[in-house]
Structures are given as C-alpha cells and as structure tokens.
C-alpha cells in the first residue's frame, strides 16, 4: 500500500489536531475541523489504511487514533513545513543575546532559558567548563502526598533533581519553608562552605524536616560536584509537569531520572556531532528513559569546531516545526555570541 495525497492530508490533520488537543482524533473531528473535501466515511477508510501502514494507532481506552512514532517521523521527513520565528520572538532573542553577559555560563544559561520560554518544552545544553560552582537555589514540587521533586540549581547552570520521600504530615507550605530557609542561608556558597558553617544551624532550624533536609543537602552536594567536563544546563523543568503525557508517575520518574544523569545526557546529545538539526522521536532514542519523548538538538560551533550542543526535550506530541525554528535560531545566535566571548577571554 502506497501513501497518496489524501492519506498525507489525513495524517497531517491527525497530527495537527493531536498536537493541539492531546486527545485521540476521530474521522468526524477531521471532517468538521479540516477542509479535506471528503466525507467522514472516506476519512475512516483512509485512517484504516494509515493504521495498517503503522503511521497511526489506537489507544487502548479510545475509539480515536493518535500518531505513532513512525507517523511523527513521516511527518517530520515528508510533511512538515519549515517555520521561522515571528518578529516579536526574534526581537526577544536578539535583545537577550545582546545583553552584556561576560561569563560563558551566563550566556549558556540565557540561551537555555530562551529555548524553554519560546517553546514551553524542557531545554538542555552542553557548554564549556568555566569558573567555580556555588549553590544558587532549591525548589520542591509535590507530585504525590508522600513524594516531591527536589530541583537544585548551581551558579554554573548545573541542575540536579530527585524524587524525595516526604513525611505524610508535611504540607506544601512546609516544603516551601524548607526551600526558603535553605536558599536564604546557602545561596552563593561552595559545598565546603556549606559543610563548614551552616549545616548545624539548618539542622537546628529545621528539626521537624530533618529527612528532607538531609536528602536536600545530598542533592546539593551532587550538583556542586557534578560539573566536571562539559557543563550541563537545563531550563523549563516546570514545562514537564504541564504535559498530560507526564501525569503518569512512572513516565515522569523515568524522564527526571535521565535529566539528573548528566553523563547519559551528554551521550544522548552527542549522538550527532555534525552540523544541522537532529530529531529523535520516541523509540529512536536509545535510552529507555526518553523513549516517550522527542529530542531536537543542534551543535554550535567556533570556526568549524564543535563547542557544544543545545536542544529540547518534550513529548512525541511536539510542535516539531516550532521546535526546529527555535533551535536553529538560537544555535546561530549562540555561536556568534560565544565567538566574541571566547576569543576575548582566550578560551
């Protein structure tokens, strides 16, 4: 069975609708919302063929259809229209990247923040190792009555996260109190300074939350000592929680587990060192933890030499054309800004 123009239009419509709504798509929906010029019955026949070709599939609990990983791949390779950033987005990028950022780490974190902000996905980047790392902040995000995600950020942009067990009696307000106190007393300190001066004080102040405090300090230690080699930058962690796919706690744990394994992330991001945009969809990713996700990455360069990689991680139900446009633009801007910065600093 061959793909023809009508099948392509039906597949395109299914993907557009599913990306937009996160709901399985039926033939009546396509007939009503997309002007394909054919009846729901004809669309049903085409959907049956698309399912036979492996391009769409039926979720267990629904009569509608959703794209398969193969369907997304066909869309990206054959149907996707290239997009560019709109004028306001371009102004935002150029304004942010033209700020007088002196440190490479600041430039990398700014880039990662922009990637996440412009796409609403989670942004990752690998950059040169510069400077001495200090603790910046910790945040807790309750995900179950007895579990919370703890996220630690360092001055280098390194981010560590773990799902922590918390006492059943501990409220979100209690978690907020812990994070505020840790941030107020530890921000800007190295791990040696943390150990030397403040652990006893914090232990006294947070007697009732000792279990959470102990695990938090372990996580801070990992973050401050996990930046050997290329530094790993991450932004848009909260965007993960907005995606319906990751309301499944197991999927969420798998993804968060990968994001905290910086060496694994380095390997995943270095799969394609050659120039250009690279897209890996679902099962194309070689690590189990990201097989429910898609990754859009590109390397940035200095005089033809690869400096590092930036990219996005999101559900396979991703706006690929938007993701590609943002990664392309920021790769170009980052290469230009780092060229000036690294030459001046002699790195």
UniProtKB/Swiss-Prot annotation:
MF annotations from Gene Ontology: DNA binding
Protein biosynthesis keyword on record: no
Keywords: Repressor, Stress response, Transcription, Transcription regulation
Family matches, as InterPro entries: GAF-like_dom_sf, HrcA, HrcA_C, WH-like_DNA-bd_sf, WH_DNA-bd_sf, WHTH_HrcA_DNA-bd, WHTH_transcript_rep_HrcA_IDD
GO biological process: negative regulation of DNA-templated transcription
Role played: Negative regulator of class I heat shock genes (grpE-dnaK-dnaJ and groELS operons). Prevents heat-shock induction of these operons.
Family (UniProt): Belongs to the HrcA family.
Full protein name: Heat-inducible transcription repressor HrcA
Record organism: Heliobacterium modesticaldum (strain ATCC 51547 / Ice1)
Gene field: hrcA
């Amino acid at each position: 069975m061959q793909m023809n123009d009508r099948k392509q239009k039906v597949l395109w419509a299914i993907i557009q609708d599913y990306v937009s709504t996160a709901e399985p798509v039926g033939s009546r929906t396509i007939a009503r919302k997309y002007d394909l010029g054919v009846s729901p019955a004809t669309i049903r026949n085409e959907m049956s063929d698309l399912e036979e070709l492996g391009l769409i599939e039926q979720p267990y609990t629904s009569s509608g259809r959703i794209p398969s990983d193969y369907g997304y791949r066909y869309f990206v390779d054959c149907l996707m229209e290239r997009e560019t950033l709109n004028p306001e987005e371009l102004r935002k990028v150029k304004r942010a990247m033209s700020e007088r950022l002196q440190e490479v780490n600041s430039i990398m974190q700014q880039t990662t923040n922009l990637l996440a902000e412009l796409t609403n996905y989670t942004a990752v980047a690998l950059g040169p190792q510069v400077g001495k790392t200090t603790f910046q902040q910790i945040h807790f995000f309750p995900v179950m009555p007895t579990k919370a995600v703890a996220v630690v950020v360092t001055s280098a942009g390194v981010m560590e996260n773990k799902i922590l067990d918390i006492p059943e009696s501990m409220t979100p307000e209690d978690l907020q109190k812990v994070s505020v106190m840790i941030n107020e007393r530890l921000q800007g300190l190295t791990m040696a300074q943390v150990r030397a001066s403040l652990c006893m004080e914090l232990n006294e102040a947070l007697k009732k939350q000792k279990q959470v405090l102990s695990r938090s300090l372990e996580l801070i230690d990992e973050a401050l000592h996990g930046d050997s080699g290329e530094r790993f930058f991450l932004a848009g962690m909260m965007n993960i929680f907005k995606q319906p796919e990751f309301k499944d706690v197991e999927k969420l744990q798998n993804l968060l587990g990968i994001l905290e394994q910086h060496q694994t992330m380095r390997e995943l991001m270095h799969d394609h060192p050659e120039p250009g945009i690279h897209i890996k969809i679902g099962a194309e990713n070689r690590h189990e933890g990201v097989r429910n996700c898609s990754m859009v990455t590109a390397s940035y360069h200095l005089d033809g030499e690869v400096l590092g990689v930036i990219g996005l991680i999101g559900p396979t139900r991703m706006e690929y054309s938007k993701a590609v446009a943002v990664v392309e633009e920021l790769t170009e801007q980052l290469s230009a800004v780092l060229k000036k910065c690294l030459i001046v600093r002699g790195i």
